[in-house]
């Protein structure tokens, strides 16, 4: 098939509809001939097509037609287009509406765009009546009546026939089409002689039951039948028009219906394009429960017999396979035979006689039961990233479940509690070859962004890894027994005694080095814990091996070590019993006694405080402060439990070093002090969304406690441990949390899935070009993909080493640091980066040497400097800043830290060039990779828990998925959280006093009312401690009261006095007269006074000022004060003195003030911050998404495609059925570039893998090189002239 590079859309011409010779003229028939179910319209339900004689799979259907007897029927979706055109012409004479007469000798094609617009304004202006002297009729407004189902004159509601409109529109001369934006013959907006009947393929029969009788039909078929019926009856134009609208889009005439029609099946998420073309149900698939198997490797998948006997694979007949096929036929293993010459598929059964059907010519194929070692794709849903779907080799296994290696369960998010997986056997040999390379676990070993292995040990293998390393004094036989089938090549090197360390050295099998971890392939760390063997860890031994050699060695280590760990467990055993957890009851009894004693003390102290408040001995705290103090006392109790347990664990390790539970804890697998606290100490405070349960009826959560009880246990503090068991009320509190979590999981799965789809839709066409830049279509997004122009899985986070005077080249390193340090001090100067991105893991090649053998200091510096200069020019074209790479090499290879030989240095830089040249291929789908990683992470995070910035009473800056969602939706006209940072607290306090909401009621006033002869007197007594606590003054309180009364419309006259009652209290006396009705208005006034007398912006949040240590540099910190305030616009801060105050606005304020580039940087950091600690590696995908959202002059939401419009097919694929209609109407031409369009036209998308060669425009490179060399030579001449002048 020829490669299609461009597609043009247009409307069907009436001649094309008339050209079909299948005439439909009957409503019902015995053999369906001539009806809308005519067999000539295509193959259905196993029957061959009566037009072309082909099967369902080969026949795409044929169109029919029904005569409409010269009636003019409007194509329903273009009613609005017809009304638009009628607004430009006179319905009486058909000439264009114009302010003045126009001539028809203008050549519009010769006019410029500007001149055409001016002519448009002149000719198509609004005027009351026609300028044509032979017409002079007033212009009529034509609309479409839903009630009458026809066009009507808006003025008098009289029907306007379709034929009249048809005549007027086709009479518009072609030369005026550009003026009216007509792109094709207007007659195409109507059906005239015949109406088209679509093929059967788009209306498959649906079975349903009516009155116990099964019926098979399709709603579209029924609606087409109604059109045929009306046409046969020669019905009125409106009747046929209504039938056509009901078939096309019922919503045009009726709002409250959801019946199936053409519009319904092509729009929304269940549209036919999505269900039948983009993805569809396939055969040769299986689904089953999964289970673990220790006999298969990471690259294999175990398949039960019933799946192996059901699925078949094709073997094509050619010179290489013909003998094998003959053997298979002879041994009766062939299930189907396809004869290409006869176009015939034959099922081969036992005892069936086959004559003259088997010729075994090239192109024929046979189907046999799937064989071992065939590549099969399998995966677990939801497929959040590409590690969920992989292609492995089939192995025959016993039982009825699909078996997978425990090494891959982490990457698939699977466990063995009933999870199911699906598998599909691809039939096309090209597909099988492609999947066996690109989707093979060895290929996918390292994470696309994180760079660490996605496969690794789980559960008891982690404990085995820890125990194996610690084992000592093994004889050779014991070592060989542990190594099992891998022991044949073990070399004892003359030793008699061995340790676990020797077994690891053998398994690693490479002379690999890594600072503090490996030396010549030997582990020099104190212990092997989970960090060395599990997936997604940078210190994973498999990852270091693959960085040193290749993924093959990495996978081999995982396979071999997994086997050895399991053998170790089967030989030496490992088990945890309740006795390991709780050897005797002494410790738990002691903990329980401490907990009971402490909680009683807390309750006693709290009760004393409440009694003192009631008796007026002390002034009560605010509700938030009171809750905070109770919370901190309970936290102290929890921390006491953890401290006791940590001490107990330490003591147990001394007394019983072989305690298996503590071994697990040391190995980094399961059981930490917090988990032990739940089991042995106390179950702790139960929270919903980070807060204790709210009180409900009668001021309590459960009826186990007295009304309005302040008992901490009544708010969800569970004192008992799980060992002791929970009481009824405690169980209900734990279930209260479980209920809210299960609801959250259900809702969040749906929300995160929706956003993930949108992000992938937005980023899917973003790829790497031949120059290592990121592009989308023809738009450049990033100069350097992954910042290093090296594949993301090859890049590696390394420690960021800060400049130090003890370093060699200190001045050069310090100068570089000053250039790049801004990027490492982030999050409002609160954080200092500890890691940075290295272009590859060069540390595995760093082999320490002695001073004598080491490369000279100057030679090493020159080498680093020359390499970076060369790379900067030849790979980054001096456009991108790569100072960070130079900084990494200068600090990590610094002679003051480590001495290396010249050979080691050369190896490192050769590897560097190798990675630059061969890892990142043109066409790498970096957009999809980034979108999947972001989506997978925020889905996991939304399901695990919601984390917020903890600050009592303040605006809780929502983190996690909610905030990520808000950032990507970019809603305008919403309040934004503005952060103010300053070292001068007084600057922030003035903002706080103005914006923080304080009402009279918060000051616990004592309000009394009395009536005097001609007025009411209100006394408001406030304790000054409350005023001080609210951080305001007495004058502000006076102002609050005064402001409220002065603006009150129910107060007729008023006066006010302020008295100092005593050293603690102040009295505000207000004298009032109310407008009539006095009594009612007095009641209203007294009711609203505590809340309505206020100051600041109305909000339930306070604005606390917190202090933190801010970084100016890695060695320079200062005390800073910070506060967050919710504002609509920064103009509200205009009247304050904010000199030397750093203001961090929200995204839209940032854009309005600093422009699009600042908005991009803000979005990138804000999105990254929503993930919380430990997700710094997501900076690159966040940066890519932020760059895309800010690719034009204004930030654009992930929901929209305003800039860089999406192709018609992409819109149609994602459920916009109007996209194809509009493209056809405007006769759009579009290139076939994006994924969706390529899918439709069988074109390979422009994405690569980094495995294949790619081609680049060398001419452009040569021109760039010439320009650069010209520039350099002119610069050198200039320098020489200056030197001579000197």
Curated annotation (Swiss-Prot):
<dbReference type="InterPro" id="IPR007083">
    <property type="entry name" value="RNA_pol_Rpb1_4"/>
</dbReference>
<dbReference type="GO" id="GO:0044423">
    <property type="term" value="C:virion component"/>
</dbReference>
<protein>
    <recommendedName>
        <fullName>DNA-directed RNA polymerase 147 kDa polypeptide</fullName>
        <ecNumber>2.7.7.6</ecNumber>
    </recommendedName>
</protein>
<dbReference type="InterPro" id="IPR045867">
    <property type="entry name" value="DNA-dir_RpoC_beta_prime"/>
</dbReference>
<dbReference type="Pfam" id="PF04983">
    <property type="entry name" value="RNA_pol_Rpb1_3"/>
</dbReference>
<dbReference type="InterPro" id="IPR006592">
    <property type="entry name" value="RNA_pol_N"/>
</dbReference>
<dbReference type="Pfam" id="PF04997">
    <property type="entry name" value="RNA_pol_Rpb1_1"/>
</dbReference>
<dbReference type="GO" id="GO:0003677">
    <property type="term" value="F:DNA binding"/>
</dbReference>
<dbReference type="GO" id="GO:0003899">
    <property type="term" value="F:DNA-directed RNA polymerase activity"/>
</dbReference>
<keyword id="KW-0808">Transferase</keyword>
<dbReference type="InterPro" id="IPR038120">
    <property type="entry name" value="Rpb1_funnel_sf"/>
</dbReference>
<keyword id="KW-0548">Nucleotidyltransferase</keyword>
<dbReference type="Pfam" id="PF00623">
    <property type="entry name" value="RNA_pol_Rpb1_2"/>
</dbReference>
<keyword id="KW-0240">DNA-directed RNA polymerase</keyword>
<dbReference type="InterPro" id="IPR000722">
    <property type="entry name" value="RNA_pol_asu"/>
</dbReference>
<dbReference type="GO" id="GO:0006351">
    <property type="term" value="P:DNA-templated transcription"/>
</dbReference>
<comment type="function">
    <text>Part of the DNA-dependent RNA polymerase which catalyzes the transcription of viral DNA into RNA using the four ribonucleoside triphosphates as substrates. Responsible for the transcription of early, intermediate and late genes. DNA-dependent RNA polymerase associates with the early transcription factor (ETF), itself composed of OPG118 and OPG133, thereby allowing the early genes transcription. Late transcription, and probably also intermediate transcription, require newly synthesized RNA polymerase.</text>
</comment>
<dbReference type="Pfam" id="PF04998">
    <property type="entry name" value="RNA_pol_Rpb1_5"/>
</dbReference>
<dbReference type="GO" id="GO:0000428">
    <property type="term" value="C:DNA-directed RNA polymerase complex"/>
</dbReference>
<dbReference type="Pfam" id="PF05000">
    <property type="entry name" value="RNA_pol_Rpb1_4"/>
</dbReference>
<dbReference type="InterPro" id="IPR007066">
    <property type="entry name" value="RNA_pol_Rpb1_3"/>
</dbReference>
<dbReference type="InterPro" id="IPR044893">
    <property type="entry name" value="RNA_pol_Rpb1_clamp_domain"/>
</dbReference>
<dbReference type="InterPro" id="IPR007080">
    <property type="entry name" value="RNA_pol_Rpb1_1"/>
</dbReference>
<keyword id="KW-0804">Transcription</keyword>
<comment type="subunit">
    <text>The DNA-dependent RNA polymerase used for intermediate and late genes expression consists of eight subunits Rpo30/OPG66, Rpo7/OPG90, Rpo22/OPG103, Rpo147/OPG105, Rpo18/OPG119, Rpo19/OPG131, Rpo132/OPG151 and Rpo35/OPG156. The same holoenzyme, with the addition of the transcription-specificity factor OPG109, is used for early gene expression.</text>
</comment>
<comment type="similarity">
    <text>Belongs to the poxviridae DNA-directed RNA polymerase 147 kDa subunit family.</text>
</comment>
<keyword id="KW-0946">Virion</keyword>
<dbReference type="InterPro" id="IPR007081">
    <property type="entry name" value="RNA_pol_Rpb1_5"/>
</dbReference>
């Amino acid at each position: 098939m020829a490669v299609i590079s461009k597609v043009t859309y247009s409307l069907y011409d009436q001649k094309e509809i008339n050209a079909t010779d299948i005439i439909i003229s009957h409503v019902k028939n015995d053999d369906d001939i001539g009806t809308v179910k005519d067999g000539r319209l295509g193959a259905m339900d196993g029957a061959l097509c009566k037009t072309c004689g082909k099967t369902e799979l080969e026949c795409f259907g044929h169109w029919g037609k029904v005569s409409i007897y010269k009636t003019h029927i409007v194509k329903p979706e273009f009613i609005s287009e017809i009304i638009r055109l009628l607004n430009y012409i006179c319905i009486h004479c058909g000439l264009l509406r114009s302010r003045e007469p126009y001539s028809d000798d203008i050549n519009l094609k010769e006019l410029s765009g500007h001149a055409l617009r001016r002519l448009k304004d002149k000719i198509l202006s609004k005027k009351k009546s026609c300028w044509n002297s032979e017409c002079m009729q007033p212009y009529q407004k034509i609309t479409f009546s839903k009630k009458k189902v026809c066009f009507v004159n808006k003025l008098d509601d009289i029907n306007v026939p379709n034929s009249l409109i048809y005549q007027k529109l086709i009479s518009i001369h072609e030369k005026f089409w550009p003026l009216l934006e007509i792109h094709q013959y207007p007659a195409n907006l109507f059906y005239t002689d015949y109406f088209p009947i679509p093929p059967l393929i788009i209306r498959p029969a649906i079975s349903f039951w009516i009155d116990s009788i099964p019926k098979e039909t399709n709603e579209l078929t029924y609606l087409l039948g109604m059109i045929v019926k009306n046409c046969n009856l020669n019905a009125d134009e409106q009747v046929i028009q209504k039938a056509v609208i009901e078939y096309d889009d019922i919503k045009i005439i009726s709002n409250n219906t959801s019946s199936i029609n053409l519009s319904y099946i092509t729009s929304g998420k269940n549209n036919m394009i999505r269900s039948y073309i983009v993805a569809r149900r396939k055969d040769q698939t299986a689904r089953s429960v999964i289970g673990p198997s220790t006999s298969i490797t990471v690259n294999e998948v175990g398949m039960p017999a019933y799946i192996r006997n059901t699925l078949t694979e094709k073997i094509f007949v050619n010179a290489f396979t013909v003998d094998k096929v003959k053997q298979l036929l002879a041994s009766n293993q062939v299930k189907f035979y396809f004869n290409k010459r006869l176009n015939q598929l034959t099922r081969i059964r036992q005892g069936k006689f086959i004559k003259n059907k088997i010729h075994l010519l090239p192109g024929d194929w046979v189907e046999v039961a799937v064989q071992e070692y065939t590549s099969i794709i399998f995966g677990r849903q939801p497929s959040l990233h590409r590690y969920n779907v992989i292609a492995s080799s089939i192995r025959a296994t016993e039982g009825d479940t699909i078996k997978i290696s425990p090494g891959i369960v982490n990457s698939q998010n699977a466990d063995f509690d009933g999870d199911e997986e699906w598998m599909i056997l691809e039939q096309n040999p090209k597909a099988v070859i492609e999947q066996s390379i690109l989707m093979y676990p060895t290929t996918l070993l390292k994470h696309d962004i994180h760079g660490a292995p996605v496969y690794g040990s789980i559960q008891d293998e982690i404990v085995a890894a820890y125990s194996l390393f610690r084992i000592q004094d093994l004889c050779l036989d014991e070592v060989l027994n542990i190594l099992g089938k891998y022991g044949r090549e073990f070399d004892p090197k003359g030793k008699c005694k061995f340790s676990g360390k020797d077994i690891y050295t053998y398994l690693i099998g490479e002379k690999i080095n890594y600072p503090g971890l490996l030396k010549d392939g030997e582990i020099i760390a104190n212990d092997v814990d989970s960090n060395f063997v599990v997936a997604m860890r940078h210190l994973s031994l498999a990852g270091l091996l693959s960085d040193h050699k290749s993924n093959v060695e990495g996978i081999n280590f995982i396979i071999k070590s997994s086997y050895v760990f399991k053998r170790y467990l089967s030989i030496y055993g490992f088990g945890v019993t309740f006795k390991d957890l709780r050897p005797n009851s002494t410790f738990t009894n002691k903990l329980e006694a401490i907990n009971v004693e402490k909680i009683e003390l807390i309750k006693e102290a709290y009760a004393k405080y409440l009694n003192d408040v009631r008796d007026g001995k002390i002034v009560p705290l605010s509700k938030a402060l009171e809750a905070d103090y109770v919370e901190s006392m309970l936290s102290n109790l929890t921390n006491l439990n953890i401290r006791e347990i940590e001490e107990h664990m330490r003591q147990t390790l001394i007394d019983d070093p072989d305690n298996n539970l503590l071994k697990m804890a040391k190995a980094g697998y399961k059981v930490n002090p917090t988990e032990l606290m739940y089991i042995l100490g106390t179950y702790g405070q139960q929270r919903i969304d980070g807060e204790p349960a709210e009180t409900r009826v009668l001021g309590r959560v459960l009826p186990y406690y007295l009304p309005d009880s302040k008992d901490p246990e009544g708010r969800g503090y569970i004192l008992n441990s799980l060992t002791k068991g929970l009481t009824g009320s405690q169980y209900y509190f734990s279930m209260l949390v479980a209920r809210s979590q299960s609801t959250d999981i259900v809702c969040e799965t749906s929300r995160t899935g929706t956003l993930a789809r949108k992000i992938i839709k937005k980023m899917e066409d973003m790829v790497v070009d031949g120059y290592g830049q990121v592009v989308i279509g023809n738009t450049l997004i990033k100069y350097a993909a992954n910042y290093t122009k090296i594949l993301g899985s090859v890049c590696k986070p390394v420690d960021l080493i800060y400049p130090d005077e003890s370093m060699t080249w200190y001045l050069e390193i310090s100068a570089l640091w000053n250039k790049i340090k801004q990027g490492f001090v982030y999050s409002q100067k609160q954080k200092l980066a500890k890691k940075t991105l290295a272009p590859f893991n060069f540390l595995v090649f760093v082999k320490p040497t002695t001073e004598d053998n080491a490369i000279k200091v100057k030679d090493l510096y020159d080498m680093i400097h020359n390499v970076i200069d060369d790379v900067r020019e030849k790979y980054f074209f001096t456009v991108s800043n790569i100072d960070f790479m130079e900084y990494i090499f200068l600090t990590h290879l610094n002679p003051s830290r480590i001495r290396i030989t010249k050979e080691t240095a050369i190896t490192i830089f050769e590897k560097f060039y190798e990675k630059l040249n061969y890892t990142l291929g043109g066409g790498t789908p970096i957009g999809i990779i980034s979108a999947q990683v972001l989506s997978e992470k925020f889905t996991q995070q939304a399901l695990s828990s919601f984390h917020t910035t903890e600050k009592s009473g303040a605006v809780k800056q929502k983190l996690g998925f909610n905030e990520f969602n808000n950032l990507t939706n970019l809603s305008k006209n919403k309040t934004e959280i503005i952060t103010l940072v300053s070292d001068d607290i007084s600057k922030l306090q003035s903002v706080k006093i103005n914006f923080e909401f304080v009402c009279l009621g918060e000051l616990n006033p004592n309000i009394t009312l009395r009536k005097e002869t001609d007025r009411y007197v209100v006394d408001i007594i406030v304790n000054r401690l409350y005023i001080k606590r609210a951080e305001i003054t007495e004058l502000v309180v006076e102002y609050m009261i005064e402001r409220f009364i002065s603006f009150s419309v129910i107060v007729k006259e008023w006066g006010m006095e302020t008295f100092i009652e005593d050293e603690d209290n102040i009295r505000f006396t207000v004298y009032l007269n109310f407008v009539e009705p006095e009594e009612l208005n007095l009641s209203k006034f007294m009711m609203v006074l505590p809340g309505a007398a206020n100051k600041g912006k109305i909000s339930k949040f306070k604005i606390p000022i917190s202090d933190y240590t801010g970084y100016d540099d890695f060695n320079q910190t200062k005390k800073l004060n910070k506060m967050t305030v919710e504002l609509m616009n920064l103009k509200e801060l205009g009247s304050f003195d904010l000199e030397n105050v750093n203001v961090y606005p929200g995204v839209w304020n940032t854009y309005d003030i600093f422009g699009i580039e600042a908005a991009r940087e803000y979005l990138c950091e804000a999105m990254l911050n929503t993930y919380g600690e430990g997700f710094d590696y997501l900076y690159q995908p966040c940066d890519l998404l932020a760059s895309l959202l800010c690719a034009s002059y204004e930030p654009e939401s992930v929901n929209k495609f305003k800039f860089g419009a999406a192709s018609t097919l992409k819109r149609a694929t994602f459920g916009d059925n109007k996209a194809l209609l509009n493209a056809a109407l405007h006769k759009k031409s579009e290139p076939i570039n994006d994924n969706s369009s390529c899918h439709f036209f069988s074109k390979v998308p422009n994405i690569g893998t980094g495995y294949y060669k790619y081609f680049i425009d060398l001419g452009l490179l040569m021109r760039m090189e010439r320009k650069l060399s010209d520039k350099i030579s002119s610069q050198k001449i200039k320098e020489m002239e200056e030197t001579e002048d000197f």
